[in-house]
Amino acid sequence: MSFLSFLLGQKKSSASVAKERLQIILAHERGRGDSPDYLPQLQQELVAVISKYVKIDPEDIKVHLERQDTLEVLEVKIEMPQN
């Protein structure tokens, strides 16, 4: 089935595209070794994407990167409105 999907040009899900972008960003930052300057831009893009589906306040999304030795943890907290 995946070969047919490739030939027919079916779109990737937004989740898989976002995952790939985050992996690229993290790999790039690991190579540089300095502080992550992409976090504000990442937060803005997350607000834009989530706002397409749910009305949220930009302050409801928190992005934090924690580094310990060889481990990096990207933490994203999103407060969803009560419906």
Curated annotation (Swiss-Prot):
Disulfide bridges in this chain: none
GO biological process terms, semicolon-separated: cell division; regulation of division septum assembly
Known SUPFAM superfamilies for this protein? Cell division protein MinE topological specificity domain
UniProt keyword terms in alphabetical order: Cell cycle, Cell division
Establish whether keyword Cell division is in the entry. Answer: yes
Q: Which InterPro entries match?
A: MinE, MinE_sf
Listed NCBIfam families = minE, PRK00296.1, PRK13989.1
Its family remark reads: Belongs to the MinE family.
HAMAP family linked: MinE
Q: What does this protein do?
A: Prevents the cell division inhibition by proteins MinC and MinD at internal division sites while permitting inhibition at polar sites. This ensures cell division at the proper site by restricting the formation of a division septum at the midpoint of the long axis of the cell.
What is the designated name of this protein?
A: Cell division topological specificity factor
Its source organism is: Bordetella pertussis (strain Tohama I / ATCC BAA-589 / NCTC 13251)
